[in-house]
């Protein structure tokens, strides 16, 4: 969620042999403790972060890392996690330590304790942490002579003992890594005696006083190493920042994010729900949510037809062999629901007369689209062939990661598969990226960057040469767009590299939206061919593309982006008529009929509530246009506009008001209407 500004990268400095990095930082007169941009660590020529106590053997050039950069904040948070662990073991001496990494905007630490932590426990821990920070304990790096020495020291820490031999490369495991096994001791600032310590590869800030602002946010249960077969531990989450101002800003964003939480708004606005009877991650859309979803899909359909896509439909289940051919059962089985074994026939004795077959709920639409391509001979004249489907797919997500609409088990993807020649590939990718960005902008999402996900060396199909060609092609197309491109090493699916569009919402949070995946492998597995101009048979290049990612996820992101106040063209109810008194209801019903004839979604509130209460109710339901009418309005054939920001436009002739509303909706204006913006629009 980080929306707090970061400082620009610092210029490199030189650290003479035998001198600490911290001394070089002071010699360069760079900001020290107490400044928001205090230098907390340095980065060496190999890109490794080093403590300020690091003393190189030769003269080296390093880059100072400030507290108000993402790397600097990560170091502060990691050190704050150590302070938390020290406080826990002081207040709960029987607690055993798990892992405690920095994470986006914060940190956590896992503990094996007898009872879950309470809010009162967190308050006590915060108080103790503040004292540790005030004491200015030193972080001191120490190298173990051997693994046996580490095991001896950590004999009473079973989870740390497991990590001593860890070779998983898990980025969350900050305890081990690199070519040495190290610990960080917290030393008394005056006596230099060891107060506490932890198995850790570092780096860390010089002293605890480099943590100017922190807060513990919550606690929860968590399985050791994220495996439900392991012990259940207690996890404490916290956040730490380079200044109190930055922390306050972050907490304000957290509060605003909670206000915008789509799960909360889904209930308040009657959009969707998650009935227990259906199971985790399986949402149902209510009529109001169905309107928004239909508008999202209908506009997308129209734009896809204009862009030359052909619509297809495929079933929700399939025989096992399809996913053997595609490789999903080999590489993606953990993300699929278990097989359904059906169609077996038995005789009177219960003996199998005809064996059954395994069927699977489809986790992806692509294999079925390949069958459509393969259903008849194809010519180069048909390419690029763009197949598109709003296809329902089902993926087994662990219950712990299912989250509202943004992480579900049953979803609908706006899924396209494009079959091109190699000669068409680059132009098609460029055209496709432009189409994706244009459509996202139409929905009001116009702040984005690109991410390039490359091969996972342990999980891929096809040759290295094909992967390299596909990756470089995507890289060139992405760079040509002029957008920022961020690497995602090892993040690709097993069948090809991808570009993903990372969208920033109104709070500055990044969401992965559209994906464009290049695939030279699947055409081989399905033996897809077309007849080239010279009569030869060739393999097409395959491009996988999902613009929304899934309708459900996109719906959730838009709900939070707009805080539930959808643009008028998407709003479930676009206009509500509010009579000053019951006598004015028939007049507003005439106005409503006029709007309905123009395709506007309109209601008239004829409830027994007073007018003021009705205005509050419909403001809370985030209806973009409220039309009020009393005696003067009805006599003059006019209405008064009321908007969510409490502004009004009084006495607007009804025909003019209808045209203003119809034009606003037809123009697909994404901002919330106000008296000022509607008047400005009417004046054009």
From Swiss-Prot:
Molecular function GO terms recorded: ATP binding; metal ion binding; threonine-tRNA ligase activity; tRNA binding
Gene Ontology biological process: threonyl-tRNA aminoacylation
Residue pairs linked by disulfide bridges in the UniProt entry: none
Start and end residues of each stretch annotated as Catalytic: 261-567
Residues annotated for Zn(2+) binding in this entry: 366, 417, 544
Entry keyword annotation includes Protein biosynthesis: yes
Cofactors, names only: Zn(2+)
Cofactor note: Binds 1 zinc ion per subunit.
Main location: cytoplasm
InterPro entries associated with the record: aa-tRNA-synt_IIb (IPR002314), aa-tRNA-synth_II (IPR006195), aa-tRNA-synth_II/BPL/LPL (IPR045864), Anticodon-bd (IPR004154), Anticodon-bd_dom_sf (IPR036621), TGS (IPR004095), Thr-tRNA-ligase_IIa (IPR002320), Thr/Ala-tRNA-synth_IIc_edit (IPR018163)
Source superkingdom: Bacteria
EC identifiers of the protein: 6.1.1.3
Enzyme class name: ligase
Annotated TGS domain residues: 1-66
Known catalytic reactions: tRNA(Thr) + L-threonine + ATP = L-threonyl-tRNA(Thr) + AMP + diphosphate + H(+)
Subcellular location: Cytoplasm
A Pfam family reported for this protein in Swiss-Prot or TrEMBL: tRNA-synt_2b
Gene Ontology, cellular component aspect: cytoplasm
Swiss-Prot/TrEMBL keywords: Aminoacyl-tRNA synthetase, ATP-binding, Cytoplasm, Ligase, Metal-binding, Nucleotide-binding, Protein biosynthesis, RNA-binding, tRNA-binding, Zinc
Subunit text: Homodimer.
Functional note: Catalyzes the attachment of threonine to tRNA(Thr) in a two-step reaction: L-threonine is first activated by ATP to form Thr-AMP and then transferred to the acceptor end of tRNA(Thr). Also edits incorrectly charged L-seryl-tRNA(Thr).
Family, per entry: Belongs to the class-II aminoacyl-tRNA synthetase family.
Name listed for the protein in its UniProt record: Threonine--tRNA ligase
Species assigned in the record: Mycolicibacterium smegmatis (strain ATCC 700084 / mc(2)155) (Mycobacterium smegmatis)
Name of the encoding gene: thrS
